[in-house]
Amino acid sequence: MKSFVVAPFIVAIDGPAASGKGTLARRIATHYGMPHLDTGLTYRAVAKALLDKGLPLDDEALATDAALSLDLLAMDKAVLSAHAIGEAASKVAVMPAVRRALVEAQRHFANALPSSVLDGRDIGTVVCPDAAIKLFVTASPEVRARRRFDEVLARGDTADFAEILADLKKRDERDMNRTDSPLRPAEDAHLLDTSEMSIEAAFLAAKKLIDHALAQHRG
């Protein structure tokens, strides 16, 4: 009698900053009862570890040490969402050794579970290239900047829309043109433009694709 191992069912969600991929990933994870990992938080956690110790952000060896000792289950999204940490994270994220260490941790998270939802910039292309379903979530820079602007105001902080828009465009440029794991859709990813979509509409579009992939996965 043959025995076989069923591959984990991984939902890979990629996209630029403020595209809505995180909100969608959390909604999907809740609906299907799947563990969720926001891989962007892993880079923020490394940056915060360096900032907390007053260490330089451009030291790849120190940043890699922080990445290797990171506890994925101890990350606090509320704490890591600070703008300064996001800026610092974009600097450590371009370091190849840091990316390798975090990709390995992210991949282990996905492969150790029967099913999971991961969102980030390179899930479908690098972290989980064999994911059962890949979504690339995007929206126009102006729509994404408006979402980020509204988020900041909702927290009771002040924000400048033009500054947020310029920052997003700069981050897009950096993400798409870095030599290691540039931001791009996987060849087999489903493109989901949420520019004119509500959260519910985006979820229903994703759910239809995931339900089909689940049916195929279960044979």
Curated annotation (Swiss-Prot):
Q: List the keywords (alphabetical).
A: ATP-binding, Cytoplasm, Kinase, Nucleotide-binding, Transferase
GO MF, any single term: CMP kinase activity
Answer whether the UniProt record assigns the keyword Transmembrane helix to this protein: no
Give the E.C. number(s).
2.7.4.25
Taxonomically, the superkingdom here is: Bacteria
Q: Which GO terms describe its cellular component?
A: cytoplasm
What is an example of a Pfam family matching this protein?
A: Cytidylate_kin
| Places the protein is found | Cytoplasm
| Hydrolase keyword on record | no
Q: What is this protein called?
A: Cytidylate kinase
- Taxonomic lineage from the root: Bacteria, Pseudomonadati, Pseudomonadota, Alphaproteobacteria, Hyphomicrobiales
Q: What gene is it encoded by? A: cmk
